[in-house]
């Protein structure tokens, strides 16, 4: 059906032969946290289109979970298991992104991703993807719904920092592959919450598996979502893993503040234009979600905001890598539990000129 890859040698055909070969894996050389291993070429199940169509009630709108960048997602039950079925839109460009998601997710699996479980590829029918069912919707819904807030999903800073850490680990896993994967569309709507309110990164339609010097990168137009898109990523040759770091920084500000990336009800409407000046003026407590107030521990309050500020630096070379971000957030989770600060040091020789309460924002 098609290929989409940065290197011809690593391309995966969306065909029956692809699924048949999934059990023969080669281990990745990339390092990953032991609690979030990546499985290379996971085993996939091939479904009949008619079975998936029936399981969704004929793609009944009552089973519609949401619409993504390249199709719709429906709830279904196969046997006793809840699954989600992704159905592509009819646009050729959308179909290409849909196939790209298959190419990426058919090769990796992790507890930090919304994993691919199977597919249907009947010649006379549209292709369908079967992914894990996430019972608590998207992080966007969690953050921006008072109903969910009241249920306790993000009612404490320990829970919010845990969610941020889980997302950071997901992005780090992508970047640490032997051939890095750049997601290009990290946002709260693409982070889904499972039944235990663990965060998983999904929607890999815009992702690219390649080294930044590959010709494929240089010929792929910039893409992403307004509000999360790296301002440095204006031409194809400016794509790098730091593009994802910027988007993660926006998402972290969203988790911290409870505000949307862009919200026209406020001035300034862009979350960076509002939050970063407050951090520079030493008013970091003012960026925290007023529904639960800032963290009690002043060190946690300051350092969490500083991590976000580092990620959204205009100069991409001064942004941290996701491995650093994972380390900082891991320290913060420990500090929130112990209410003391001794695990995190975010010193960096690339220092910004602004200060927080008289100290540099590094």
Curated annotation (Swiss-Prot):
Enumerate the glycosylated residues: 136
Q: Quick one: a GO cellular component term?
A: extracellular region
Q: For bias kind Low complexity, which ranges apply?
A: 21-32
Q: Which domain of life is it from?
A: Eukaryota
Give a GO molecular function annotation for the protein. protein serine kinase activity
Phosphoserine occurs at which residues? 219
Statement: the UniProt record of this protein carries the keyword Magnesium: no
Q: Which residues form the active site?
A: 185
Q: Where is this region: Disordered?
A: 21-43
Where does the record place the Protein kinase domain?
59-329
Q: Which family does it belong to?
A: Belongs to the protein kinase superfamily. Ser/Thr protein kinase family.
Protein name as catalogued: Serine/threonine-protein kinase-like protein At3g51990
- The species is Arabidopsis thaliana (Mouse-ear cress)
